[in-house]
A protein has these predicted regions:
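An aromatic- and histidine-rich active-site surface loop
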Residues: 34-38, 86-107
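Conserved nucleotide-sugar phosphate-binding/catalytic loop shared by glycosyltransferases and other
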Residues: 1-3, 20-69, 179
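An amphipathic, basic-hydrophobic alpha-helix
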Residues: 59-88, 106
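Active-site-proximal region of nucleotide-activated glycan assembly enzymes
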Residues: 25, 46, 105-162
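Short amphipathic alpha-helix
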Residues: 8-19
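Donor-nucleotide binding loops and adjacent catalytic segments primarily
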Residues: 34, 39-43, 161-191
Length: 191
């Protein structure tokens, strides 16, 4: 499960792609308004897109609607988990992982979270206490986490390393820095 931005969705897609190649049934849980609905091009066994959104930029009304929206989202995910009986639920962050992680715990399904960032996101910080295992893209970013790196889709593994790609090149390299769909404060501050 992952939602919202590419930083959560693309690592989840990489793991889903890998598990599909290993003949696992892969179920996808995402949000109705996130990027995942547009980029989910992999054939998964079943999908559930829930109506649940972050509240940080939704003002007082968003906070007032949160309890009801959370309960409804958890209920929908519990139904999905009971019907599909997954062996494990893996969360990659984003707002939809909160009801998904709570539902996994209620259904006694092991929850594993993966934090891709050097500064953990709110969803993963909340779900860490419910998780059986915490996987990290960067070392020492969450207590009790295990550093495994960030998953990449197979399309990236076929790209030759820079030493081979640029061995014939002369002159300076031009570098494009991309900060992600929500921006990256460190890049904005430095540049």
């Amino acid at each position: 499960m992952a939602g919202g931005t590419g930083g959560h969705v693309f690592p989840a897609l990489a793991v889903a792609e890998y598990l599909k190649k290993k003949q696992w049934d892969v179920f996808w849980l995402g949000g109705t308004k996130g990027l995942e609905r547009q980029v989910l091009n992999l054939e998964v066994s079943r999908t559930l897109f829930i109506r649940f959104a972050g509240v940080r930029r939704n003002g007082v009304l968003g906070w007032l609607k949160l309890p009801l929206n959370l309960v409804l989202a958890i209920f929908n995910v519990v139904k999905f988990l009971i019907k599909n009986k997954p062996n494990v639920v893996i969360g990659f962050g984003g707002y939809v992982t909160v009801p998904g992680g709570i539902a996994a715990k209620l259904c006694r399904c092991p929850l594993v979270i993966h934090e891709q960032n050097a500064t953990p996101g709110l969803s993963n910080r909340l779900l860490a206490k419910l998780s059986k295992k915490i996987l990290l893209g960067f070392p020492n970013t969450m207590p009790k986490g295990v550093h495994v790196g960030n998953p990449l889709r197979s399309a990236f593994s076929s790209i030759p390393p820079p030493e081979l790609r640029y061995r014939e090149r002369n002159g300076r390299l031009k570098i494009l820095i991309v900060g992600g769909s929500l921006g990256a404060k460190v890049f904005n501050d430095i540049l």
